[in-house]
């Protein structure tokens, strides 16, 4: 459907947006839009959304991090002084573009520069599309809050949180359809190379550190997409997040009576996460029915943080990753990490499948804690670091004996520094994985981790392990997959892999492994219309 387009400049946009109705298409003309734009209680329709666009419009003050650094640190210190974790999270609603109580709105092809702390903020909104945005700097690229916030589509957006390196060159190359081996050899950002992790996210309880107003970098402690207790139905696809602290981060801290109605139905697919200083994917507290597929991760301290109290029905497959670069200055103690971060205790409402992914790592898969109903099968893993102690799949201390009898108190004390060995009790399965490590599978099995019989300790024979080329992780050797059937939240089952048809790893011939779309994405309201509007 083609919509008539009205043009407006920085001097009149604030009055004009108040009168938008279904079917309006407002084009922001070339210029700098420094004052916040607020869309409040506006409703488009499924077949005629309100569209806000403008290829040459720049929203934000263009404030550089260095100019905001002390302010951000002081605001974090104020939070710390009140007994809270030091951060700018409580100020995320201070955004350049705010949508409040809105439905059926598309924001596309806008640029944001120097929006501290937030570029786009959604509050109690439904059916919002954010497409083709370019966001430079900021603590939060996109923030979302409200238990009625749902059906949010974020696609084809680029965010470089710290542009002091060549992050935008990486984005430009990828958008041009190029590989990025050359760009990855270019200068990384100060956030990746020079800033200590604790200067961004350290606190007194965990790290013995108070906020240093002059030297810290608390304004970087944010995310590409941060959700505070929203209903869900979120799709984040085909975005590029480079030189940032975090990628996608959900909280679910609502009252117990409505916990189950938040952080549900999330699809994260086809994104690039490049030089992420903390986590790429991080659902916290409670979450259900997440699909994470076909993403590319290039250097991330800790890609998957799954520190949830209760969750279920996670499907993580077809992703490729290289963790080969060491972040931070020499004194930084947060440089190696692990691939999965687990909680102290966890209850599973359903399975969590991690299958047919391809990784090149310099750290363990998981070093400590526990997780319930975790199924890790058919993954292909090689290493960029030759030291077997620091890359041992379950941590260098995996041979330590678990306490006799494994009573809960003793178990949790042991697991504070070790990956759990209570696999049968927790429903943990590792099978069909090809992991190129000298301790795998024999030494790992002997240490009390009951790996499946199809686990192999050989090279997956990736054709090219150089970072940045996803097809380089196609294997030269065929290793048959083990059969895997997925349980869906509604009780249905779907075949994911069959030994006679599939191989280990993300690549199945010339394509990444495919499984049926989540039902909520198949029947996404306005899905076809959204494509026609662009």
Write out the residue ranges for each language-model feature:
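Right-handed parallel beta-helix/beta-spiral solenoid domain characteristic of secreted/periplasmic
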Residues: 4-11, 25-30, 34-36, 43-116, ...
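Parallel beta-helix/beta-solenoid
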Residues: 21, 42, 47, 92, ...
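Acidic, glycine- and Ser/Thr-rich low-complexity intrinsically disordered tracts
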Residues: 27, 69-84, 172-223, 372-534
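Structural detector of coil-to-beta-strand junctions
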Residues: 36, 96, 118-119, 141-143, ...
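Residues in short coils/turns that link rungs of repeat/solenoid architectures in beta-rich domains
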Residues: 114, 136-137, 142, 161, ...
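Solenoidal tandem-repeat scaffolds enriched in leucines and small polar residues
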Residues: 147-269, 274, 280
């Amino acid at each position: 459907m083609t919509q008539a387009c009205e043009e407006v400049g920085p001097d009149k946009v604030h009055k004009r947006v108040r009168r938008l109705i279904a079917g309006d298409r407002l084009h922001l003309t070339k210029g700098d839009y420094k004052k916040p734009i607020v869309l409040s209680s506006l409703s488009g329709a499924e077949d005629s959304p309100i569209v806000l666009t403008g290829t040459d419009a720049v929203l934000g003050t263009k404030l550089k991090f260095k100019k905001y650094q002390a302010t951000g640190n002081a605001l974090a210190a104020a939070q710390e002084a009140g007994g809270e974790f030091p951060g700018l999270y409580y100020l995320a609603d201070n955004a350049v573009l705010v949508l409040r109580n809105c439905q059926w709105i598309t924001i596309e092809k806008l640029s944001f520069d120097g929006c501290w702390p937030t570029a786009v903020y959604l509050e109690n909104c439904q059916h919002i599309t954010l497409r083709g945005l370019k966001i430079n700097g900021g603590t939060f690229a996109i923030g979302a809050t409200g238990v009625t916030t749902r059906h949010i589509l974020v696609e084809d957006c680029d965010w470089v949180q710290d542009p002091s390196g060549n992050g935008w060159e990486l984005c430009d190359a990828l958008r041009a359809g190029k590989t990025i081996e050359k760009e990855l050899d270019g200068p990384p950002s100060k956030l990746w190379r020079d800033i200590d992790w604790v200067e961004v996210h350290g606190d007194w309880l965990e790290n013995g550190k108070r906020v240093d107003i002059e030297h810290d970098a608390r304004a970087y402690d944010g995310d590409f997409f941060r959700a505070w207790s929203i209903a869900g139905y979120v799709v984040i696809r085909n975005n590029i997040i480079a030189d940032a602290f975090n990628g996608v981060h959900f909280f679910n801290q609502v009252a117990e009576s409505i916990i189950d109605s938040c952080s549900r139905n999330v699809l994260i697919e086809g994104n690039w996460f490049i030089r992420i200083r903390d986590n790429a994917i991080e659902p916290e507290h409670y979450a259900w029915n997440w699909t994470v597929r076909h993403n590319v991760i290039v250097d991330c301290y800790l890609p998957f943080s799954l520190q949830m109290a209760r969750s279920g029905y996670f499907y993580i497959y077809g992703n490729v990753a290289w963790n080969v670069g060491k972040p931070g200055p020499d004194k930084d103690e947060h440089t190696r990490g692990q691939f999965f971060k687990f909680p102290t205790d966890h209850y599973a409402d359903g399975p969590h499948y991690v299958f047919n992914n391809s990784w090149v790592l310099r750290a363990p898969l998981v070093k400590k804690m526990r997780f319930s109903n975790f199924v890790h099968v058919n993954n292909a893993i090689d290493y960029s670091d030759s030291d077997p102690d620091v890359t041992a799949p379950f941590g260098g201390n995996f041979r330590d004996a678990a306490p006799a009898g494994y009573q809960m108190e003793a178990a949790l004390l042991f697991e504070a520094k070790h990956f759990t060995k209570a696999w049968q009790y927790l429903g943990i399965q590792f099978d069909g994985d090809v992991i190129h490590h000298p301790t795998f599978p024999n030494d790992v099995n002997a240490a009390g981790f009951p790996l499946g019989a199809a686990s192999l300790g050989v090279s997956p024979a990736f054709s090219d392990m150089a970072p940045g080329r996803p097809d380089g992780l196609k294997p030269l050797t065929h290793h048959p997959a083990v059969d895997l059937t997925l349980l869906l939240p509604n009780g249905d089952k779907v075949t994911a892999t069959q030994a006679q048809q599939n191989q280990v790893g993300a690549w199945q011939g010339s394509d990444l492994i495919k499984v049926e779309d989540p039902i909520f994405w198949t029947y996404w309201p306005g899905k076809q219309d959204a494509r026609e509007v662009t």
